[in-house]
């Protein structure tokens, strides 16, 4: 089993981090991305406050996932997840609550939105890079899975539209918390690459309770989360190259949406 896990991790690392990283690098050069950098007063102190806020939000997310797991334990899971406006609104409100420690800390520290990657800086370039990455990943997965075009066409319905909005809410919320808030502060404190690696690992492992809520065993959930690290790294690298959460946010949305179409 572990041989398969290591092999899959290697394939994902090659696909996302080597090939994907090279694509992001050259797209940033071609589009002439402008780099402003991020400056925080007292980087160590700011990073520690960011860690505390993100830890609180992560604990809240974990608690919600555990409750969801307990609630679903006595129910027969549907093979097809349905989405609608109510689910999207509920997701948005839930994430607003889950992000409250980060938003409150940001307010207390008087940090601007720009210091979390939320600005019009490299706006068009970020949208384009995020869309290109998302489309390439979507096409690659479709080809690899051998799913017929007719099946995908059939799945492009109203449910898929609401699913896209729902994944956009979750994707951008996660990117704001981990990439825009935590990663930027860690980069300012411990350096660009260390900040990227630490944030990517933390974000990937945060999905363990989510996977368990979906019915995986603890061992399966850990393996699934570890296999998310390459994807997490490329999203973090995309944030570094664009300095805007739009690019990783769009990519994240498409990546999560793929399964709805297959």
Can you say where each PLM-predicted feature lies in the sequence?
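Transmembrane helix-loop-helix hairpins at the membrane interface
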Residues: 1-6, 10-26, 137-262
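Membrane-interface helix-boundary motifs at transmembrane edges
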Residues: 33-45, 113-122, 183-190
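Alpha-helical transmembrane segments of MFS and MFS-like solute carriers/permeases
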Residues: 49-57, 128-133, 165-166, 183, ...
């Amino acid at each position: 089993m572990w041989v398969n896990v290591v092999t899959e991790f290697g394939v994902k690392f090659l696909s996302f981090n080597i090939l994907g990283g090279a694509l992001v690098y050259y797209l940033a050069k071609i589009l002439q991305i402008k780099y402003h950098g991020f400056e925080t007063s007292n980087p160590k102190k700011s990073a520690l406050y960011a860690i505390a806020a993100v830890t609180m939000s992560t604990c809240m997310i974990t608690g919600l996932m555990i409750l969801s797991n307990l609630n679903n334990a006595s129910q027969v899971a549907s093979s097809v997840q349905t989405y609608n406006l109510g689910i999207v609104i509920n997701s948005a409100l839930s994430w607003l609550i889950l992000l409250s420690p980060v938003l409150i800390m940001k307010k207390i520290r008087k940090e601007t939105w720009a210091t979390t990657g939320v600005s019009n800086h490299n706006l068009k370039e970020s949208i384009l890079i995020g869309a290109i990455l998302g489309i390439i990943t979507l096409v690659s997965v479709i080809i690899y899975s051998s799913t017929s075009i007719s099946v995908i066409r059939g799945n492009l319905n109203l449910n898929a539209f609401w699913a896209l909005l729902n994944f956009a809410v979750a994707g951008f919320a996660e990117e704001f918390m981990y990439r825009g808030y935590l990663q930027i502060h860690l980069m300012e404190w411990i350096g660009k690459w260390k900040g990227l690696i630490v944030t990517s690992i933390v974000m990937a492992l945060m999905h363990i309770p989510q996977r368990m809520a979906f019915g995986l065993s603890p061992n399966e959930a850990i393996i699934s989360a570890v296999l998310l690290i390459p994807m997490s790294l490329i999203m973090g690298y995309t944030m570094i190259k664009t300095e805007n959460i739009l690019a990783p946010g769009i990519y994240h949305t498409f990546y999560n949406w793929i399964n709805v179409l297959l």
